[in-house]
Structures are given as C-alpha cells and as structure tokens.
Curated annotation (Swiss-Prot):
The chain crosses the membrane at residues 31-51, 75-95, 151-171, 222-242. Its main location: membrane. The keyword Transcription does not apply. GO terms for molecular function: high-affinity sulfate:proton symporter activity. It comes from the Bacteria. Pfam families: EI24. The gene is cysZ. InterPro entries: CysZ_sulfate_transptr, Sulfate_CysZ. Belongs to the CysZ family. The lineage of its organism: Bacteria, Pseudomonadati, Pseudomonadota, Gammaproteobacteria, Enterobacterales. It is found in: Cell inner membrane. This is Sulfate transporter CysZ. Keywords: Amino-acid biosynthesis, Cell inner membrane, Cell membrane, Cysteine biosynthesis, Membrane, Sulfate transport, Transmembrane, Transmembrane helix, Transport. It is a multi-pass membrane protein. High affinity, high specificity proton-dependent sulfate transporter, which mediates sulfate uptake. Provides the sulfur source for the cysteine synthesis pathway.
Amino acid sequence: MVSSFTSAPRSGFYYFAQGWKLVSQPGIRRFVILPLLVNILLMGGAFWWLFTQLDVWIPTFMSYVPDWLQWLSYLLWPLAVISVLLVFGYFFSTIANWIAAPFNGLLAEQLEARLTGATPPDTGIFGIMKDVPRIMKREWQKFVWYLPRAIVLLILYFIPGIGQTVAPVLWFLFSAWMLAIQYCDYPFDTHKVPFKEMRTALRTRKITNMQFGALTSLFTMIPLLNLFIMPVAVCGATAMWVDCYRDKHAMWR
C-alpha cells in the first residue's frame, strides 16, 4: 500500500497519533509483536516495582525542600512524583530500546516500505542477526551522547529549591528531545544515515520533534498505555521520516 502521506510536514502531535493508527495496519502487526513483548515485560515489571517504592522515595525527595519553600509543598509533591516517573520511565525505556533495537529497525523498514511503495533491502532474519553489532554500536552512540547531559540534570535534583522546581521541567524537555532522537533514529539508521547527521536533520524541525517527544514522554509515564508506546513511537517516527526527511536522506527508493 502506497501512503497517502503528503510531503508537507505536520505537527509532532499528528505523527504521534499516526503511530497509534499505523501500529495495527495489516501486514505490519507481525513486526510489532517482538518490540511489544519486550516493552510489556520490561516496562510492566519495572513500573509495578516502582509503584511499590513511591511511598519511600517521594518523602526522601521532599526532604531536600528547604524550609522557605515548605509553603509550596502541595505543589512540589506532584512535581516530585512526576520527576520520579520521568527519570524512571526514560531509564527503563532506554533499556527496552537497547534490547528491541534490531526489531524496531525492522519495523521501521517494513512500515516505510508499506507507506511509500519502495522496496527495502532483502535482509530477512539472517540479515538482522548480521546487522546486530552495527545496531548496538548505534545504540551506544546515543547512550554516550545522552549520559553526560543526563548526569548534569540529575545533579540539579540535589540542589535545594532548584531540584524540586526547575529540574523537573528541564528533565521533561530533555527527555522529550532524547526520545525524539531515540525513535526517529530507527528509520534514519535503516538508511545508514550517520548519527551526527541525523541529529542535525532533527534540529531543522525541532518544534515538531519536541512535540512528538513530549507526547512520547508523557505516555511513557502512564501505566498500561506505556506498555504499547515503543512500537507506536517507532511507527509515528517512521511516518515523520517519510514526510519530512526521506526525500533528502533515503538510501533505497
């Protein structure tokens, strides 16, 4: 099926919504199963454990609030909960993406072929296995780019006042951008676009990608819905690639 997508770019919210529609397309569902299973097992177990620990973690987090901000505690409490969910959700979604990276790449490749009518390389299961070292190297590049920035933001959480007010907002913006990079990278990587070139391309449509990443980040925090977010985000990012980036960066047509 050739896509009815136009070359005119839409908002990041649009592409996120498209992800939910595309994930259930006939012929695509079988490529969704493995990423979905990885996400359900890892994110489901991780968030179940998290919710058993919140009554310990949140009071500890709130103990860093200085006395002069105690009058804002009724506002800072939900911010503390959101902060824990953001950091925890992003950490475990990163692990899930590492494990499912080869299958996410295959999903992006097959969906792109369906949307455009193009013929992808005939990889098959053996081609995927052969490509695993390169895919893992790509995931490592993302991790190395992300880690020092994440550490700086996490340090802010331990600064009284800033850690309970400014840091959660900065972390949300950072995780939105990083999740846009994470999921948009799959269709870019199927065309062997270098990591640095991919980041440069995303910056040309930064608002669109921040919108997409922000919704992905929010849904990663929501129990049950976050179990399905990985394949949905891959599909949405692939739709964005087809509309916004494919003409310039595609290796196969």
